[in-house]
């Protein structure tokens, strides 16, 4: 990729923007060296890592980069077996902690989306928690070693503290004794030794060692002889403390050196992740999307925005290239946005090929090009004494020498700066030569000859930047398929140029040129109208899809409620049957107990008969229930993924496991996973019309009930028996309707009805808890019930 083109397209400014989102100098250095990658595979992988980081920012929030540093200098010293400073060790530990936490941050549950590229990067993390912990345990700050760093250090500092207390007690006593000889009744420290500020004329009155004097010489700082030994002991302890700290730092530094490969690897991964997440943060800030990358020269930028233009003012452009045509000629007035269009296309390609998401709509397509050449702006050099034309031609010669079918070439005002006739002819020749090579070209021009060339030549298409003649301002919108119209006469007229001058000018233009311009104007108007209609249709489609999605979600929610209600009802029915059977067995057990106690065996026989009748009747009810749900033969074999009918709940389910030795299988019913026996499974296609009809009717009835259920029931005016029946029926409907909380209005009155309702609620199967209403809810006139 040519460095000159990268500079012209201002990719360096994107790099500077990216640096603002990094946490470390090392990541900034990675961005400084960022350039388009050398293969389409690399581009896709680096785009994927950016996309994954972007998703993680949304789903998990900010990554764990707190306290991460650039530790390259510390690593370099550790490699040389040097002893590191406390601050350097702390920063290394912080980076190791960041690497470990990032591994935890990237982890996901089985049902969550995976992050393939980032997970592969994080697999290289060594994780050195022991070293990390030792450093944080031993060092508390940039220049502070913790007492707990070693038992020796702890003992030294404890002794040092005790000695200091002793010296301070002693010197305070001396201050009182020598107060008449001192400048001030205080003590101070000179060279780690406690001294007294003695007046120079009384130096003989305080025997001791002189350590310093004031700037005027009026005060001598004397260490009393009685403190010399104590001060010596303190000094010795301080030297021991220093030696122990040095030993601790040496040991920790040696551990870094012993694990230098892991430390360097973890640090490099953290810096790479810092760079990747800087790309993601940039994408989030600039509303970027991940484009589809191909290597076939196909470009489809949908509403691309130049990232260096103020987001409140930038006008999105849509550009296609490479399928129906490989060359695009853009015409239009000066300051109309032609050059911005070229730079937008070029810069978006450089961003995508450097692994950055692009400021464009979803589903945009970018092609990987080996080279992007840009001849944009006036690049003439005063030192080289080159004219505008010569400067452009120098660039073009270099482009012609290197461009091939895997190149994108951007020409701004091709052929300008010389005689229009010769310039147009030269431009057509250059374009045609590159087109035959298969080069993808976007060029801006003022020449009508190039408009005509694009109209005639297959594989070349016209485009124009829209201009509003009413306001005399460009709209900056790109219209593909329509050549730009010269607006010189209209602009001149609106600016006040007399009509007779404009009319005379028109007479000097050939009829063919006039008709050509009129044709272009007509095409522009039709194209603008068609694009407006297309935008309106797109907006209507989006609105329709939005409404459709909303109602589908509502329908799905109701379906889930229905499924859960059916499953709960069937499960409750089975529990009732099971409890009845257990009760019958309990009765029989009691009868046997009575018989052992001497009661008549005849009574036992009669109760045994009653039990058998009850059991037979319950079995009959259960069998009848299953049969009425669905007629058909039980399946003999099923496999994972089969869609079958679970007869007991009349519900289609998906088989999740093979039958075990008891014939039990795991199935998915709606959003629930339940265990069922293979005998309860039927072929999904085997349901007859009657059962289907029955199922539909039940479903409709349930949905109807769900729509009608209210959040409160009014019992005022009812007697106790009627109120209990009404509340019981209402709670069933509210429970099936999925209501979490309901209100029972019973009025205040004498309180009899309230007490009756509360007694009933105590043992109700649907009630989780209840309470009297609060102020604003109805007070003691209502009872608020929370359902299970």
UniProtKB/Swiss-Prot annotation:
The Smr domain covers which part of the protein? 713-788
Q: Which domain of life is it from?
A: Bacteria
Keyword list, A-Z: ATP-binding, DNA-binding, Endonuclease, Hydrolase, Nuclease, Nucleotide-binding, RNA-binding, rRNA-binding
Write down the Gene3D superfamilies for this protein, in alphabetical order. Answer: 3.30.1370.110, P-loop containing nucleotide triphosphate hydrolases (3.40.50.300)
Q: What is its EC number?
A: 3.1.-.-, 3.6.4.-
Q: Which CDD domains does the protein's record reference?
A: ABC_MutS2
Task: Extract the InterPro entries matched here.
Answer: DNA_mismatch_repair_MutS_C, DNA_mismatch_repair_MutS_core, DNA_mismatch_repair_MutS_sf, MSSS, MutS, MutS2, P-loop_NTPase, Smr_dom
In alphabetical order, the GO MF annotations are: ATP binding; ATP hydrolysis activity; ATP-dependent DNA damage sensor activity; endonuclease activity; mismatched DNA binding; ribosomal large subunit binding; rRNA binding
Kindly indicate whether the keyword Isomerase belongs to this entry: no
- Does this UniProt record's set of keywords contain 4Fe-4S? no
GO process terms (BP): mismatch repair; negative regulation of DNA recombination; rescue of stalled ribosome
Q: Tell me the residue numbers annotated for binding ATP.
A: 332-339
Q: Which Pfam families match?
A: MSSS (PF20297), MutS_V (PF00488), Smr (PF01713)
**Complex formation:** Homodimer. Binds to stalled ribosomes, contacting rRNA.
Tell me the function of this protein: Endonuclease that is involved in the suppression of homologous recombination and thus may have a key role in the control of bacterial genetic diversity. Acts as a ribosome collision sensor, splitting the ribosome into its 2 subunits. Detects stalled/collided 70S ribosomes which it binds and splits by an ATP-hydrolysis driven conformational change. Acts upstream of the ribosome quality control system (RQC), a ribosome-associated complex that mediates the extraction of incompletely synthesized nascent chains from stalled ribosomes and their subsequent degradation. Probably generates substrates for RQC.
Query: Family per UniProt?
Result: Belongs to the DNA mismatch repair MutS family. MutS2 subfamily.
Protein name as catalogued: Endonuclease MutS2
Question: Which organism is this entry from?
Answer: Clostridium botulinum (strain Okra / Type B1)
The gene for this chain is: mutS2
């Amino acid at each position: 990729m040519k460095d000159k083109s990268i500079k012209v397209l201002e990719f360096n400014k994107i790099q500077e923007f990216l640096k603002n989102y990094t946490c470390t100098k090392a990541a900034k250095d990675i961005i400084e060296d960022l350039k388009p990658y050398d293969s389409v595979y690399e581009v896709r992988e680096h785009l994927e890592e950016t996309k994954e980081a972007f998703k993680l920012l949304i789903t998990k929030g900010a990554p764990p980069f707190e306290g991460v540093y650039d530790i390259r200098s510390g690593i370099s010293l550790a490699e040389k077996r040097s002893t590191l400073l406390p601050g350097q060790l702390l920063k290394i530990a912080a980076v190791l902690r960041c690497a470990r936490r990032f591994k935890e941050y990237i982890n996901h549950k089985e049902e969550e989306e995976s992050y393939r590229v980032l997970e592969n990067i994080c697999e290289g993390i060594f994780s050195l928690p022991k070293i990390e912990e030792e450093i944080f345990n031993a060092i508390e700050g940039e220049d502070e070693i913790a007492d707990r760093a070693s038992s020796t250090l702890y003992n030294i500092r404890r002794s040092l503290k005790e000695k200091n207390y002793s010296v301070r007690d002693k010197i305070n006593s001396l201050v009182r004794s020598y107060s008449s000889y001192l400048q001030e009744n205080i003590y101070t420290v000179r060279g780690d030794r406690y001294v007294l500020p003695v007046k120079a004329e009384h130096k003989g009155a305080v025997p001791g060692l002189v350590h310093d004097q004031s700037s005027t010489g009026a005060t001598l700082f004397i260490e009393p002889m009685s403190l010399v030994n104590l001060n010596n002991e303190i000094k010795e302890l301080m030297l021991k403390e220093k030696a122990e700290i040095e030993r601790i730092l040496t040991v920790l530094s040696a551990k870094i050196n012993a694990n230098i490969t892991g430390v360097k690897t973890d640090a490099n991964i953290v810096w790479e992740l810092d760079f990747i997440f800087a790309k993601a943060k940039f994408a989030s800030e600039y509303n970027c999307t991940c484009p589809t990358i191909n290597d076939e020269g196909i470009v489809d930028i949908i509403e691309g925005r130049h990232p260096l233009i103020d987001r409140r003012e930038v006008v999105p452009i849509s550009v296609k290239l490479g399928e129906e045509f490989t060359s695009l000629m853009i015409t239009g007035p000066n300051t109309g946005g032609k050059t911005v269009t070229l730079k937008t296309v070029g810069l978006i390609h450089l961003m995508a090929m450097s692994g950055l998401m692009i400021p464009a709509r979803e589903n945009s397509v970018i092609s990987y090009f080996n080279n992007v050449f840009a001849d944009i702006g006036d690049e003439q050099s005063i030192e080289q004494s080159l004219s505008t034309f010569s400067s452009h031609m120098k660039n073009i010669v270099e482009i012609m020498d290197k461009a091939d079918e895997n190149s994108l070439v951007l020409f701004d005002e091709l052929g300008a700066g010389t005689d229009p006739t010769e310039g147009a002819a030269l431009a057509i020749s250059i374009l045609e030569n590159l087109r035959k090579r298969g080069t993808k070209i976007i060029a801006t021009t003022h020449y009508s000859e190039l408009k005509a060339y694009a109209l005639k030549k297959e594989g070349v298409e016209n485009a124009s930047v829209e201009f509003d003649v009413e306001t005399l301002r460009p709209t900056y919108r790109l219209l593909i398929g329509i050549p730009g119209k010269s607006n010189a006469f209209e602009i001149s007229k609106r600016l006040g140029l007399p009509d007779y001058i404009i009319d005379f000018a028109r007479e000097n233009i050939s009829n063919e040129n006039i008709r050509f311009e009129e044709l272009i104007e007509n095409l522009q108007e039709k194209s603008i109208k068609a694009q407006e209609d297309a935008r309106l249709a797109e907006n209507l489609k989006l609105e329709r899809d939005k409404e459709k999605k909303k109602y589908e979600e509502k329908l799905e929610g109701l379906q889930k409620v229905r499924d859960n209600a059916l499953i709960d009802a069937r499960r409750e029915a089975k529990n009732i049957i099971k409890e009845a059977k257990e009760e019958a067995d309990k009765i029989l057990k009691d009868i046997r107990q009575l018989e052992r106690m001497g009661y008549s065996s005849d009574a036992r026989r009669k109760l045994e008969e009653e039990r058998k009748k009850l059991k037979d009747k319950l079995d009959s009810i259960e069998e009848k229930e299953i049969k009425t749900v669905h007629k058909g033969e039980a399946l003999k074999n099923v496999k994972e993924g089969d869609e079958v009918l679970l007869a007991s709940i009349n519900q289609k389910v998906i088989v999740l496991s093979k039958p075990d030795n008891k014939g039990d299988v795991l199935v998915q019913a709606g959003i629930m996973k339940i265990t069922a026996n293979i005998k309860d499974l039927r072929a999904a296609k085997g349901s007859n019309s009657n059962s289907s009809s029955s199922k539909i009717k039940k479903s409709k009835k349930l949905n109807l009930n769900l729509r009608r259920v209210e959040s409160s029931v009014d019992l005022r005016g009812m007697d106790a028996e009627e109120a209990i029946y009404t509340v019981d029926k209402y709670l069933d409907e509210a429970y099936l309707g999925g209501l979490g909380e309901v209100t029972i209005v019973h009025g205040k009155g004498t309180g009899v009805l309230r007490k009756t309702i509360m007694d009933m609620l105590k043992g109700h199967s649907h009630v989780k808890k209840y309470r009297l209403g609060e102020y604003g809810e109805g007070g003691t006139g209502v009872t608020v019930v929370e359902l299970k």
